[in-house]
């Protein structure tokens, strides 16, 4: 959005995340332009590692960098998850401020990264293409891997309860790197920790689970207890909804690249997604991944026209 780009000329991303007034403003900007049913808080999944003592930044050449490499037992032991609420109060404040500006009929979503996804960034030292270090840790030093995952899981549980207390109506867990797990290890390396988090939330709010590239693992994803499965664009919604039945609602799954094309292509693809989803309750239209910076406003407007028209039909 132009208004977001204007803010970015004055403040960097991390500064906006850490400043409640700015984070709330960015959260609300899309709501002023488009007839959306829900807002998602402006933040980043890496606020958890930062709260534990491992900061993050954006590399000049692109991608995410962690302030140091989590490569020894001493460094993992030093991660402190006892001050989550204190260190992440700015997120709670941003949620409360955003909630106060939204209407009663508009939901506010909080979110976090899954323990596995966060561990990938922390152990690899940031964005990577091969994920060698995190797999080596999980295989070669399972006790140390377990320690890291437990610290992350406990911190996330506290963080999500804090988000609910601050006004979040629902929560989304992003297991963005679950797809790099060997098929035989996905449950033990990632899903069991997600299951524990959802169990500890005790049904306070609905939980959405997004696992990129894991459409073939939907039966296992459902075992986490998530209320809603968020699917990427590689999944056929019709067949997936038939296999899920009433076990969970479904969210998705327009390819974000569509919004960089033309309004006509956007309308066509949006109608295709809606047709695949069918007319049964339990479907939330969304993108299959995050918005691409080069998305065109006129395409977003075309998307809103189609989805809103379908909803009101």
Predicted regions and their residues:
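Active-site loop segments of alpha/beta catalytic cores
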Residues: 2, 87-313
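Short, basic, glycine/proline-bearing loop/turn elements
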Residues: 5-17, 73-84, 222
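Short, flexible active-site-proximal loops enriched in glycine and acidic residues
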Residues: 38, 67, 107
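Glycine-rich, proline-tolerant flexible connector loops at the mouths of alpha/beta enzymes
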Residues: 38-60, 70, 77-84, 112, ...
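A gly/proline- and charged-residue-enriched helix-loop-helix capping module
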Residues: 61-101
